[in-house]
């Protein structure tokens, strides 16, 4: 009997081990996707409009007047508790100063002029009008021009890149490369149209972005992205490795099951997972989970009931400002909760109010927050997360990025991680906060991408 029981236990152990190994290391087949799926109103027309139309940003007088009237007529806010700064969320006394600035000092017309300093366009992709900026560099002899698609996250738009675009499109004496930049508003964000159909998740947005680049004549291209843009970009690199030549992300993350196991192994043996210098960005896990629990309330609302929170934010510019500004502040420096500004003073106030204004005038807060619900409710997203991307990838981790993963975890998703940078400054909105550091890393990473492809060609020819 003992031998039978021992054999049974051994069999269960072996079987369990095989199942666990399969779950951790199995690479599923890519999902079958309709690469021309229609996201516009109604059904696909016989002939689709493929024109590329110049576009100009306009904060018109009627919209500005309505906004200012709403701000003037706002109800008094409840004051913060005694001794509380930003620990409970947006400090309403500080918010009052921001709203007064927005009402009386923010120059709507001048800000629109600044936003229009780049060439803006719209084109219809799979039924939705997508807005994008396209900036061509000065071409000098001996300098290679690399097409670069840039994608933002929530609650941003292509405006987030207005400080980094001039750096990327200007040749640098230490490099023989420069970028032609296409900075796009994700569907439902900024000046891009949102869909009226469910299912427009990061995988499907990746398909749309690939089709946008094809529309613009780029068969192959590079990508830079953060936040939701990074998720979409990672899926593009996974699904279209022959078209994406390199991926640079300021929010590199692996969601493969093995990565989760490694995270928990690190709780017992942290030195196996992460360099001692950066250990406090992950461990102890109780601190990480406490931070996640504290700061992701908005995430849970938007991933479950985006339309409900959208009702409040659509009708009140003061409410919209408080909601967006609090998240932009904490994601710029989460160590400043004990200040009235909560981290906001790491960013230029006009830049922050540009984002709030763009969300307000386009009434896009609902369509943008719906991405949180779509991003976690479709099997195809989970499938693509589990497939390694073979595209050469570079990651940069700023100090106050929302989540940090060391290279040993990142390589689960990105086996060809050709460059990894960890900085002791900066935050989630890197292009606004630290544009020079971001641009420098993009240039350096592009060199590594080119070397990767050179090695690959040499291996094929030998």
Curated annotation (Swiss-Prot):
GO terms for biological process: catabolic process; epoxide metabolic process. SUPFAM superfamilies: alpha/beta-Hydrolases. GO terms for cellular component: endoplasmic reticulum membrane. Its main location: membrane. The active site is at 227 (nucleophile), 372 (proton donor), 428 (proton acceptor). InterPro entries: AB_hydrolase_fold (IPR029058), Epox_hydrolase-like (IPR000639), Epoxide_hydro_N (IPR010497), Epoxide_hydrolase (IPR016292). This is Juvenile hormone epoxide hydrolase. The chain crosses the membrane at residues 4-24. It comes from Manduca sexta (Tobacco hawkmoth). It comes from the Eukaryota. Its EC number is 3.3.2.9.
């Amino acid at each position: 009997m003992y031998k039978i029981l021992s054999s049974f236990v051994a069999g269960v152990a072996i079987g369990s081990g095989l199942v666990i190994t399969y779950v951790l290391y199995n690479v599923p087949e890519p999902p079958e996707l309709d690469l021309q799926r229609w996201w516009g109103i109604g059904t696909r027309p016989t002939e689709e409009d493929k024109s590329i139309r110049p576009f100009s940003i306009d904060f018109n007088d009627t919209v500005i007047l309505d906004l200012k009237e709403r701000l003037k007529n706002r109800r008094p806010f409840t004051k913060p508790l005694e001794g509380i700064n930003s620990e409970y969320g947006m400090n309403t006394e500080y918010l009052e100063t921001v709203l007064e600035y927005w009402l009386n000092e923010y120059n709507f017309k001048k800000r629109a002029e600044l936003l229009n300093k780049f060439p803006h366009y719209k084109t219809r992709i799979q039924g939705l009008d997508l807005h994008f900026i396209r900036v061509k560099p000065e071409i000098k002899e001996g300098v290679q021009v690399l097409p670069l698609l840039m994608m933002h996250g929530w609650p941003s738009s292509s405006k987030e890149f207005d400080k980094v675009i001039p750096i990327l499109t200007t040749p640098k004496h230490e490099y023989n490369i420069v970028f032609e930049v296409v900075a796009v508003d994700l569907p439902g964000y900024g000046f891009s149209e949102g869909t009226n159909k469910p299912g427009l998740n990061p995988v499907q947005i990746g398909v749309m972005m690939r089709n946008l680049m094809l529309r613009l004549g780029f068969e192959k291209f590079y990508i830079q992205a953060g936040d939701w843009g990074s998720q979409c970009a990672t899926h593009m690199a996974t699904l279209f490795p022959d078209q994406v030549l390199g991926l640079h992300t300021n929010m590199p993350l692996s969601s493969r099951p093995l990565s989760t196991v490694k995270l928990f192994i690190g709780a017992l043996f942290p030195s196996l997972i992460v360099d001692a210098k950066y250990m406090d960005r992950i461990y102890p896990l109780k601190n990480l989970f406490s931070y996640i629990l504290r700061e992701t309330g908005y995430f849970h609302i938007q991933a479950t009931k985006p339309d409900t929170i959208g009702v409040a934010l659509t009708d009140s510019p003061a409410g919209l400002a408080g909601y967006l500004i609090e998240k932009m502040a904490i994601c710029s420096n989460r160590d400043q909760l004990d200040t009235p500004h909560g981290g906001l003073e790491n960013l230029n106030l006009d830049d922050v109010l540009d984002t709030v204004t763009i969300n307000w005038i386009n009434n896009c807060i609902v369509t943008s927050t719906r991405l949180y619900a779509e991003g976690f409710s479709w099997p195809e997203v989970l499938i693509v997360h589990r497939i390694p991307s073979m595209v050469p990838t570079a990651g940069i981790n700023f100090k106050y990025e929302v989540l940090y993963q060391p290279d040993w975890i990142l390589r689960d998703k990105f086996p060809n991680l050709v460059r990894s940078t960890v900085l002791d400054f900066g935050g989630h909105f890197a292009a606004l906060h630290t544009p020079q550091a971001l641009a420098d890393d993009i240039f350096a990473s592009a060199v590594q991408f080119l070397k990767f492809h050179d090695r690959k060609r040499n291996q094929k020819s030998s």
